[in-house]
A protein has these predicted regions:
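Terminal transmembrane helical module of multi-pass membrane proteins
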Residues: 156-232
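Interfacial segments of alpha-helical transmembrane regions
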Residues: 26-35, 99-112, 163-170
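Internal transmembrane alpha-helix with an interfacial aromatic "cap," most often the third helix
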Residues: 81-109, 152-159
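Hydrophobic cores of alpha-helical transmembrane segments in multi-pass inner/ER membrane proteins
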Residues: 2, 79-90, 143-155, 202-215
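N-terminal signal-anchor transmembrane alpha helix
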Residues: 24-50
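Membrane-proximal helix-loop-helix units in multi-pass membrane proteins
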Residues: 116-157
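Interfacial helix-start motif at the membrane-water boundary
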Residues: 64-85
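C-terminal ends of transmembrane alpha-helices
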Residues: 42-53, 57, 116-130, 174-192
Length: 232
């Protein structure tokens, strides 16, 4: 038996093992997306809001919970780092799930940047009662929103069928309600609180749906495994 033929079974098994390992890692990274969305809701409207007597979820901004001087800020500062790590992992999972699809690769890069930008947002929080903190906070928020919109647009471009339309509708809902909430600021009022939460919720849910869509998406076999299969 030629040496090359004797090596093929071993090489094939090694390629298959790497493929399984990479697939497992990819799914773990993708799972970080839905986990980050769930933790966001629990940490903000759950833990942080419960520490602020008189805080009205239906009328006040989520940003106020992160603000310097907020009773819930001590909960949300460590959460911000956890959320950042989870979302960056999710962005990497998207990137690793879409070989050969340029639009979805760009989306993965933008989602990773979105996650990292939470660090900048943490550096420029609102300060309760201090209007001078507002401009830089708005600038940091708008840059992150641009990353979010870009990612959703590229996902819509990279998919066909239901996921494309779901991404478009989610983007429209998030953007429209975000603009409505912005116009209702500084509040408090029902339009501000509910509108902002619909805007945020549309994005958080979209992240979970995207993770499921990519979880089900089969990856192309590695080049080495394809060569082994063609040699059989």
């Amino acid at each position: 038996m030629p040496i090359a033929e004797g090596r093929q079974p071993h090489q094939g098994r090694a390629a298959h093992t790497r493929s399984v390992r990479d697939g497992t890692l990819r799914r773990v990274l993708l799972a970080a997306g839905p986990v980050s969305s769930l933790l966001y809701v629990v940490a903000t409207d759950g833990l942080a809001a419960s520490r602020w007597d008189g805080y009205l979820r239906s009328e006040q901004m989520v940003s106020e919970l992160f603000a310097v001087g907020s009773p819930g800020r001590d909960v949300l500062v460590p959460f911000t780092w956890l959320y950042t790590a989870l979302f960056v992992a999710f962005g990497a999972g998207v990137w690793n799930s879409v070989h050969g699809n340029r639009a979805l690769r760009i989306a993965g890069g933008l989602l990773t940047a979105y996650g990292l930008w939470n660090i900048m947002g943490a550096l420029y929080p609102l300060t309760l009662g201090d209007e001078t903190s507002v401009p830089m906070h708005i600038l940091a928020t708008n840059i992150q929103l641009a990353l979010m919109v870009g990612a959703m647009c590229f996902v819509a471009a990279g998919f066909h069928g239901r996921m494309r339309w779901y991404s478009i509708l989610s983007l429209l809902a998030s953007a429209l309600m975000g603009m409505v909430a912005f116009m209702a600021a500084p509040g408090p009022n029902l339009v501000l609180g509910i509108g902002e939460r619909i805007s945020i919720g549309a994005f958080l849910l979209w992240v979970a749906v995207l993770a499921v869509a990519l979880w089900r998406r089969p990856l192309p076999a590695p080049a080495e495994e394809r060569r082994h299969q063609s040699a059989r």
